[in-house]
Amino acid sequence: MKKKDIINFVILIIVIAYAAYSYYNKTYDYNETEFLMDTIVNIKVEIKSKDAEKVVSNTFDLMRELENKLSCYQTASEISKFNADEIESLKLDEDLKDIFAISSKLYSESDSLYDITIGRLADLWDFENEVIPSEDKILESIEMVGFDRLEFTDEIVRKPAGMKLNLGSLAKGYIIDKAVDFLKLNGIESGFVNAGGDIRIFGQKKPLKIGIQHPRSERGELSGTLSVTNFSVVTSGDYERFFIKDGIRYHHILNPKTGYPADTAVSVTVISKQAVLADAYSTALFLLNPQQAINLANEIAEIDAIVFYLENNEIKSLQTENMKQYMN
């Protein structure tokens, strides 16, 4: 074989090999959306084959399974049975151990304002029918709040009769994290999980722009945008579930010490590698006064945050030292 023919043959082999590599490593975007956790959940990923589409469907199955476990609104869940005093103790599997460990940490850091034993108080407030509970009912419910009253062993947790848990301030973030873990474990390298605006991005090379809803404007009007790569972004705001009566805004983020909606912030956005931390801290920081919230956030290496609050009817903000690198 002549030298020229050898060179041409080698080039041909390289071209074929590259074409084969490109074919088998070709990716395309795949979207799937379902209604879970009382919101619209969207999973968008880069995949290489139709087989990977099944992974996304299985991810939704996992999320649904976790929702059924952690929800206090699913009557068949162990949490609901525990809340109804149908069972004396709640068995702690790995998911619940994680949930309670995070809850305990934030309870301590927030001067007892972040409290997942707020379930009975939360049940009092009817935001759909715009009902303000009576003072007597609120005081009665406050008596049933207190994370430090839970009794733990290695395997179970017990509570006082009448106390109710509500994991709504961190369950969504926890489920998002588990969904991302499952996707990655099954070969999905890049994408995001978005549950009603609570989002976790993974495997992305380029930053994704995330809008921060303006707390006093129409839906879709922004107070700013973030550019993030492989982070979670979660916002808690007093504009999500609320009603206004006699000029007072009543919203769903309740202060467990007063029994009424917190009047400290109007919106808190938290960035973290873990969605569960972004979710939980967005509530915890909301319950603190703005300066306390930012002081705490600056001490927590795993998060950055921006707090919007009202001062003389004007919206102002405070942010952590590192937050500006994400702001546009």
Role assignments for model-derived ranges:
Residues 2-328:
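Mature catalytic core of soluble alpha/beta enzymes
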